[in-house]
């Protein structure tokens, strides 16, 4: 099948590459000509395990192409995915300017019947806006070309995105016709080996499903952090409590590890957007608001503990930060708790030694650019303060003991 993926960021590049691996002819489009030039040179703009190898292989096999020309990409395409960003607006709502700009361009350039798929995380009702935008442009061209808009939200985890795409838990498809459902199932069928994991529904429900999924996961994170804070007050072991509740099949162990709160490109943005969606429709989403408030406070819990132990003035103290990205296995520092912790410590005069196996360049060039008193080190053995929940595992605790033991002999 011939496919166009518009937007060559994280979602677009992973999706396009995985579709290409299954034998489809995929053209990834981006208005950033520099990014396209680099992709054509084999330079991948993001880090995701296994992605670079897969991109290069599919380019070599002539299944994956990159261009800045949408008209060129749409010539033979049956399906066009919109995978551009929906950044957070000043009021916390999702900014649809890029999605609607793409819709306008599709209406101006499409040359045959097309299924237009919203892959971006968008508020409920966006498909209607996309449809109206495309239709308006077609009317200006006096064109009666047929098209349909479909919602197909992504559920990719950074650090495991390729595996998530190639072996999905489910594929949610929101459409308004049997033709659209059939074409989408045809596209995704090669990803299923044993049984059908398609979940079909109306478009608005599909749009809502993405927000509901992320809100549930964020809620579990904030809940466990709240429990961990209470455990500390009453003298209970949060890890033992986690095991105790996680063994209940109704709860499970996923997303109940205490830490410094959630970050990344999705949860913070989507929680705010969902709260705004509710507000726009006259509903006060109290639980969602509480999830966000708990998370904001959790980012600075470790700073509060440091202040309690050493005082407000941290001049003369050096703190090691192990882990800059918002989670392991990625270089993504968007809304990473480490950013907030480091800035608060530096503001109080502290020196920082920071280590991350993937995200140091992101920190230097973007998220911590200009922040004073930071030394980026090349070895995890140079840092002791640990921010990520995975460092509190048995392996993490054992590792810390090794560091401390080694430090005594130095």
Model-derived regions: residue spans:
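Structural/interface elements that position substrates and couple domains in central-metabolism enzymes
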Residues: 1-410
